[in-house]
Amino acid sequence: MDSAHSKLEQQLQQIKKAKITAETNVDQTRRKQNEQDWLEEDSHQLTQEKRVLLDFLRSGWQGEEASGFHRYLEEQQHEESQAWRRDLQDKRTDLDIELQENKDRLHTLETKQATLQKEWSQ
């Protein structure tokens, strides 16, 4: 009986440590998501500022060469903006998956802990 209780107690301690690690991972992932939110807001703001600047430049440029260069800049800006958006979305998806995996791990540990505590009290 003492051996069984000792083994259960040891398993409960291991689960407790694993839960702390899983909770820390969840918190870290949430912090990463908050940082990602800030990056997305900054990216959106920069995109708006680039559009305003390109509109300003367009109004000052004249002639076919200037117009062609302006179109080139708009295309470059659009491509860069699309690449940034894709990258931000990929990172957002990765963080969502990471958070869900951490939550699943935590849930599994909590379930296992409850089962062991039930055994302990019997």
Q: Predicted segment positions?
A:
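Short, charge-rich amphipathic alpha-helices with coiled-coil/heptad character
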Residues: 1-31, 81-85, 116, 120
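Long amphipathic alpha-helical coiled-coil segments
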Residues: 25-42, 75-115
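Long, amphipathic coiled-coil
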Residues: 50, 58, 62-69, 73-80, ...
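Short, low-to-moderate order helix/coil transition modules at the start of elongated helical scaffolds
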Residues: 2-6, 74, 93
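Extended, charged amphipathic alpha-helical "stalk" segments
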Residues: 2-3, 38, 68, 121
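Extended alpha-helical coiled-coil "stalk/arm" regions
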Residues: 32-66
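Repetitive, compositionally biased segments used for assembly/scaffolding
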Residues: 8-13, 44, 51, 89
